[in-house]
Amino acid sequence: MSVPIDRERLVETASSMIDVHSFTGDEQKMGELMVSLYEGMGLAVQWQQVEENRANALGTLAGTGGGPTLMFNGHMDTSYSGREPWLKDVPGFQPKAFVEEGRLYGLGISNMKGALACYVEAVRALQDAGVRLRGDLLIAAVCGEIEKTQYGDAQGAQYRGYAAGSRYLVTHGGVADMCLLGEPTEGKVVLGHFGALWLRIRVHGNFIHTAFSEGKKDQNSILRMHEVLAAVQEWIPTWEGDPSNAYRGAQAIVNVGAIEGGFGWRVSRTPHHSDLFLDVRVPPTKAMGVARREVLDFVRSLAQRFPDYGVEGEVYVTAPGAEIDEGHELVRAVDEAHEQVFGSKPERDVTRWFSDASALSRYGIPTLNYGTSTGLMDVERGENLEIDGLVRTAQTYALVAQRICG
């Protein structure tokens, strides 16, 4: 049964979420907002204090019994703080909601406070229509999903992402028979996504004063890294083109994400080492242990090719991909609900970004990514979503809940 969505209430809810700053590591107040929403809806509330100033907020609409439990999962942390020099003057990347020409703007609206608002409004719509579900319906608002990790001097909660909240969730009672994850998928059904392996490659060199470096440039680790980087660029197409690294027609991809060497405050010294950082995307069909072995074998080949450079490798992120069987009942439910609301069946997709489906699926919770658009393409106005799209997405979620929970 299709239930009406209160457009104004949905916009108000989403706006209240945007207005709460919730950069990774600072999600507490957003969690408190979710709790107040749950309590206003009469949901059972579970508060999970993940660490200081970080929490998960779980709300449960209890069923009458005998039906499957469905989880709506969404992360509260935003990809940016809005204080970055290149974003501070872009209005849609600030934690202040505003509406223009049928679109809702503000930091986090697409990734993924819009989905959280749709979950809330879907449950409210079911309640307003007097729908009683047999199975439990959970809303899990979690911290720490954004793709980042502690490394070197970058320490603290703001760097603890990669499903930190959902890993805590599933080990402290936040489990279900299946999960709908409203990441921004452009309304497509994502049957699987790649995982991420982060690799550091280090090259060593001499640490000497500029005055004594004449004739020793071949011992400068930055200049040595120039050669190693060229070898890495030769290797990247072999990883991306390897059939074992492809998934459902999508190739793997490797990003040269960072390079570090020397001291900007002391360039009177040659750098004793330089580091290159790679983001290597791994298909969900390849075990991370296998991927780790393969990339470190490549590092060993570099060490053999450049025997005087002291080449080393370290894998410091292994975040597996995830997939769901196309025949799963949740996929069928989303197909049917989407077609009812949008007038056609949703397209299939594979993505190379990471999501909390990685943690959830490994805890025995089949998880499907399906949500709104990315909303990140307006470089002048910033992050935004079409309000009509939010309304229809909330309506789709409500239909999915009825089909799954009974």
Predicted feature descriptions by range:
Residues 1-8, 26, 200-406:
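Metal-dependent amide/peptide-bond hydrolase catalytic core
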Residues 73-75, 140-142, 180-183, 202, ...:
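Short beta-strand segments
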Residues 83-100, 192-203, 333-337, 368:
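Acidic-glycine-rich active-site phosphate/pyrophosphate-binding loop
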Residues 112-194, 405:
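Acidic/histidine-rich catalytic neighborhood of metal-dependent amide-processing enzymes
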